């Protein structure tokens, strides 16, 4: 998911001086459009809500990057001084409406979903979005609907996911054995960093969805793992380019573009050979080959599955494990549920079909996604027609960003939102239902967005996270890497919301 980000705080101060130096030189050449479907600089008929005072050229960037805080935190704090929505200005992007209220977020994402179903994406992303011809990049319309339906009814459909259950279980056994081997490696003292192992397990799973249940190519798994990382790293300066388009002339941005092109070529070399292989019915490749899309478009529609699925799933899983290391009582409660269920079924491991029957496991996954939504600002929405929002007129082409983090941390909706409490999502448990009615809780829990532009792979993503967490907790007791050294829960925002310091934990095999 290409979520809304602004300029990296570490780069911002250096760029401010450059911006003013180049302003006079390039003023006549600045393009105000931003990527695909860019909104006009200021749709004249929009009734903009109040917002913090802005500076010329940079808008509100000086406030968003102040103190090194991540943007979703800063926007949540700024929103406390304004109404349910505010206007934020970001360089060449011009103004956008930022929503931090649960009711208003529901209006944008669900109630008036068709009105806000357009996309605003970064300039560099067109290289990986088949020139904006992928599920995440399309504005809502017939092409988007056809592609999304093919993805959800085929590879992401329940029948196809269930058909690979045996392979999925083998993935979990391989993951556990790999972690065991890493823990026993000389000098590790039982300490492992699970992120890399979870990434590989996720790529194997996604590869079978894309290419069929029998797909088994470890060289491809390794290559795709590297390609996803290189893509994210190569596009790291994309938001500098979007916010200040004249920076395209700077060496650092030009190098970023060249690295992006190199990553694109690597992806093509990985995926292109697979297009000539037989495509099993139900696989994503089978569906894509049935369309009239050119080869280049098929390649990057496949890559979209990995780009959106690998880091989001792996990061959410490691966040969950970090919370369980920090909350041993919750970990033991989860293990007891898993052990009792396995004993009742005479099983040693948790299977995909079991996940929906394990209420505390689901609570752990949902609470993790509440606290660490993988894209805390979601993907920027664009109005496709004139509409109303919070009683104000919003013109077609207006950018609207929903701060999911602010909604998930509203103490009026979620008592003690900073506390990890899986019981919020367990009906009948103490603190269940988030302290409110289940219907309202549904409207204020939006880790995948909502409405017609909700994440197409959310059910598969939740299943994969639950499967990995369940089998790793069933197999190991997770402890701090050293006595008294709890995981660092500081955040880092690259392509998705990740742990700033990757989780390292000591694992002890359970009897």
From Swiss-Prot:
Heme binds at residue 455. It is found in: Membrane; Endoplasmic reticulum membrane. Keywords: Endoplasmic reticulum, Heme, Iron, Membrane, Metal-binding, Monooxygenase, Oxidoreductase, Transmembrane, Transmembrane helix. The chain crosses the membrane at residues 7-27. InterPro entries: Cyt_P450, Cyt_P450_CS, Cyt_P450_E_grp-I, Cyt_P450_sf. It comes from the Eukaryota. Specifically expressed in immature fruits and roots. Barely detectable in young leaves and flowering spadices. GO terms for molecular function: heme binding; iron ion binding; monooxygenase activity; oxidoreductase activity, acting on paired donors, with incorporation or reduction of molecular oxygen. Its cofactor is heme. PROSITE patterns: CYTOCHROME_P450 (PS00086). One of its GO terms (cellular component) is endoplasmic reticulum membrane. The keyword Iron applies. This is Piperic acid synthase CYP719A37. It comes from Piper nigrum.
């Amino acid at each position: 998911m290409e979520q809304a980000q602004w300029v990296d705080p570490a780069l911002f101060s250096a760029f401010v001086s450059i911006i003013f130096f180049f302003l006079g030189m390039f003023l006549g050449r600045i393009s105000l459009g931003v990527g695909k479907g860019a909104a006009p600089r200021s749709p004249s008929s929009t009734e903009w809500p109040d917002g913090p005072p802005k500076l010329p050229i940079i808008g509100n960037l000086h406030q968003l990057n102040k103190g090194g805080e991540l943007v979703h935190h800063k926007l949540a704090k700024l929103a406390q001084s304004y109404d349910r929505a505010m206007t934020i200005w970001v360089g060449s992007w011009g103004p956008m409406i930022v929503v931090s209220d649960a009711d208003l977020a529901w209006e944008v994402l669900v109630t008036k979903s068709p009105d806000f179903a357009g996309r605003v994406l970064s300039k560099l992303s067109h290289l990986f979005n088949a020139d904006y011809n992928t599920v995440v990049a399309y504005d809502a319309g017939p092409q988007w609907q056809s592609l999304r339906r093919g993805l959800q009814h085929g590879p992401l459909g329940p029948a196809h996911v269930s058909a690979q259950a045996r392979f999925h279980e083998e993935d979990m056994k391989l993951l556990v054995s790999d972690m065991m081997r890493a823990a026993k490696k000389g000098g590790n003292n039982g300490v492992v960093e699970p992120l890399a192992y979870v990434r590989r397990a996720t790529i194997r799973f996604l590869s079978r969805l894309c290419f069929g249940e029998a797909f088994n190519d470890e060289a491809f798994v390794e290559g795709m793992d590297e390609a996803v990382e290189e893509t994210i790293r190569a596009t790291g300066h994309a938001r500098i380019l979007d916010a200040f388009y004249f920076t395209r002339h700077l060496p650092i941005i030009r190098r970023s573009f060249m690295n992006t092109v190199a990553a694109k070529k690597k992806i093509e070399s990985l995926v292109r050979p697979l297009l000539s292989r037989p495509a099993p019915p139900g696989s994503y490749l089978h569906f894509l080959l049935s369309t009239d899309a050119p080869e280049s478009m098929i390649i990057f529609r496949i890559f979209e599955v990995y780009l959106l699925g690998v880091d989001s799933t792996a990061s959410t899983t490691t966040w969950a494990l970090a919370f369980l290391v920090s909350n041993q009582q919750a970990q033991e409660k989860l293990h007891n549920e898993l052990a009792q269920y396995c004993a009742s079924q005479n099983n040693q491991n948790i299977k995909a079909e079991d996940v929906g029957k394990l209420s505390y496991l689901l609570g752990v996954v949902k609470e993790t996604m509440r606290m660490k939504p993988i894209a805390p600002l979601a993907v920027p929405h664009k109005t496709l027609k004139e509409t109303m929002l919070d009683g104000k007129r919003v013109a077609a082409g207006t950018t609207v960003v929903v701060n999911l983090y602010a909604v998930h941390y509203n103490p009026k909706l979620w008592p003690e939102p900073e506390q990890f409490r899986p019981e919020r999502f367990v009906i009948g448990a103490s603190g269940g239902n988030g302290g409110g009615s289940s219907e309202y809780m549904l409207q204020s829990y939006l880790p995948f967005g909502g409405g017609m532009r909700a994440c197409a792979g959310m059910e598969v993503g939740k299943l994969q996270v639950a499967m990995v967490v369940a089998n790793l907790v069933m197999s190991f007791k997770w402890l701090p890497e050293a006595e008294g050294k709890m995981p660092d829960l500081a955040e880092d925002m690259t392509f998705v919301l990740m742990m700033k310091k990757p989780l390292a934990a000591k694992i002890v095999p359970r009897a």
